[in-house]
């Protein structure tokens, strides 16, 4: 059986809906902002609108997409070019950590200290590591 993960469902070829089993992340939309550290833990069902609204409420901004209905996980893990990119880089450049379930069913926390090699993979191809549950993003 093939498995795919669906977050925001903003895609051009319906890719997240092509598996025999679809893991629907839409209800996982919690955001936890640490205004002092200028970071946010964002669950993978969030869309750009969710992240922008929470960041703005703390007088902060995240590097997000240009369309509010874009899923933040797919956007970030795939690179993520947004309005703030000329100043702060791609969304993936602002990815600090990921928490995911591996294909073996292990719950993993990955950042530059715990596993720099997997964190390198997460920045651009993170969906290949497993099902990303949440991500830690740098805010500005």
Which residue stretches match the model-derived regions?
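N-terminal glycine-rich flavin-associated loop
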Residues: 1-3, 25-68, 78-112
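Classical protein tyrosine phosphatase
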Residues: 1-6, 12
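C-terminal substrate-binding/cap subdomain adjacent to the FAD-binding core in PCMH-type
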Residues: 88, 96-140
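Glycine-rich loop at the start of a catalytic domain that most often binds anionic cofactors/ligands
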Residues: 14-23
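Flexible loop/turn segments at secondary-structure boundaries
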Residues: 11-14, 49-50, 70-73, 139
